[in-house]
């Protein structure tokens, strides 16, 4: 029987790129809490002893950006110079400009050529769902995130006190080529930053027994499953001291782990007038409801936009041969049941709220948090009825 391998990865909240994402989204949330219609594109760079805040912000909100950045870094766990990055001791620079008026006139309702709220930029976005996991996410990315959440949990509650904030996980999964179903887990890679005193064998055993095995389905772990734990043998220097971190550099971790295409636009630090974020969330909402409705077991949707224009310039759907109805009919149903204009997306998903900090680590999709309206399946019954199933 033929098989194939597929791999996805996740990173912890202490990974330098994720530190940057979380600072950017904390800034966004602090602004939206006061000014829901603010325009925000908040970028962050973190390096040894340094946090740089830059981008474009137009708002009436009064926010202490430096305080927000420090509090976010401290919450993640970088609160000591021993870790190479200290929330209280690092220098924080603020370099925000206002949004270009040329862009603003295309986004503001009643201005520009299209009097509806136009898209904040051109671009293409994808959404995806499948029936491999309870939250309708691909297996490898779903469980990679769970491994990283487990690492964080054991670090913060003190059960493994030698853990430090920076970590990465990677899963290689074996699929049955005929059924497309997961057969077993081939390889688990987990690298975690640690205190210098911990011995390698103790660390390896603790990671396998206390992080990996409680998370991964035991029936998919076999005698042949390979465990690669801190493969270099040492991971003491990490976080922003080990690597420079930038907002928007973990876009595959943020989405589907490579199981679906990505349009290229990052999420964190962007208010929902930016379709890079809001339309990608809407696409996930559409795809998840199609799968939840039983109209397909796998669904990928692409939409595209032009700056200043409200209606999408294209909508396409691929169900990879699993659809119960034609893809043309699915597109018709999507147009009937989902408003994919920028303002429609914001209203449909209630996006003008300070809800984004939680999304900035462990994936924007596949986590059924109360704030994550794009993970609801409240359109599934209507879609199924309209499809005649």
Swiss-Prot record:
Co-factor binding details: Binds 2 divalent ions per subunit.
Name of the top EC class for this enzyme: transferase
Binding residues annotated for Mg(2+), in chain numbering: 17
Binding site residues for ATP: 15, 166-168, 234-235, 243, 249-250, 266, 270
Reactions it catalyzes: L-methionine + ATP + H2O = S-adenosyl-L-methionine + phosphate + diphosphate
Compartments (UniProt record): Cytoplasm
Positions annotated to bind L-methionine: 56, 99, 243, 274
Any Gene Ontology CC annotation: cytoplasm
Binding site for K(+): 43
CDD domains the record matches: S-AdoMet_synt
Pathway: Amino-acid biosynthesis; S-adenosyl-L-methionine biosynthesis; S-adenosyl-L-methionine from L-methionine: step 1/1
Its biological purpose: Catalyzes the formation of S-adenosylmethionine (AdoMet) from methionine and ATP. The overall synthetic reaction is composed of two sequential steps, AdoMet formation and the subsequent tripolyphosphate hydrolysis which occurs prior to release of AdoMet from the enzyme.
NCBIfam families cross-referenced by the UniProt entry: metK
Oligomeric form and interacting partners: Homotetramer; dimer of dimers.
Protein name, entry field: S-adenosylmethionine synthase
Taxonomic lineage from the root: Bacteria, Pseudomonadati, Pseudomonadota, Betaproteobacteria, Neisseriales
């Amino acid at each position: 029987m033929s098989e194939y391998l597929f791999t996805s990865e996740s990173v912890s909240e202490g990974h330098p790129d994720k530190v940057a994402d979380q600072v950017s989204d904390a800034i966004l949330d602090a602004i939206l809490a006061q000014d829901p219609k603010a325009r925000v594109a908040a970028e962050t760079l973190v390096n040894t002893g340094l946090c740089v805040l830059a981008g474009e912000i137009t708002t009436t909100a009064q926010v202490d950006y430096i305080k927000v950045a420090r509090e976010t870094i401290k919450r993640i766990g970088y609160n000591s110079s021993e870790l190479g990055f200290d929330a209280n001791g690092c220098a924080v620079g603020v370099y925000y400009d206002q949004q270009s008026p040329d862009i603003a006139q295309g986004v503001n309702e009643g201005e520009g050529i299209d009097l509806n709220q136009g898209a904040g930029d051109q671009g293409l976005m994808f959404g995806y769902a499948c029936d491999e996991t309870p939250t309708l996410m691909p297996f490898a990315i779903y469980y990679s995130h769970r491994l990283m959440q487990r690492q964080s949990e054991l670090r913060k509650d003190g059960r493994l006190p030698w853990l430090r904030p920076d970590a990465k996980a990677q899963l290689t999964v074996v699929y049955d080529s005929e059924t497309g179903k997961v057969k077993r887990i081939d390889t688990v890679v987990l690298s975690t930053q640690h205190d210098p005193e911990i011995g390698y064998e103790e660390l390896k055993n603790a990671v396998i027994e206390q992080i990996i095995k409680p998370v991964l389905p035991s029936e998919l772990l076999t005698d042949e499953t390979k465990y690669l734990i801190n493969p270099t043998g040492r991971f003491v220097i990490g976080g922003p001291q080990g690597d420079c971190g930038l907002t928007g550099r973990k876009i595959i971790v943020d989405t589907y782990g490579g199981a679906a295409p990505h349009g290229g636009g990052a999420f964190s630090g962007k208010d929902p007038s930016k379709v890079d974020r809001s339309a990608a969330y809407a696409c996930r909402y559409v795809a998840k409801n199609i799968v939840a409705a039983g109209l397909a077991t796998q669904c990928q949707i692409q939409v595209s936009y032009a700056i200043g224009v409200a209606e999408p310039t294209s909508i396409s759907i691929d169900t990879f041969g699993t659809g119960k109805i034609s893809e043309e009919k699915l597109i018709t149903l999507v147009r009937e049941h989902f408003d994919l204009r920028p303002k429609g997306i914001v209203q449909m998903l209630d996006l003008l709220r300070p809800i984004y900090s939680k999304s900035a680590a462990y994936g924007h999709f596949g986590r059924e948090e109360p704030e994550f309206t794009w993970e609801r399946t409240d359109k599934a019954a209507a879609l199924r009825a309209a499809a005649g199933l």
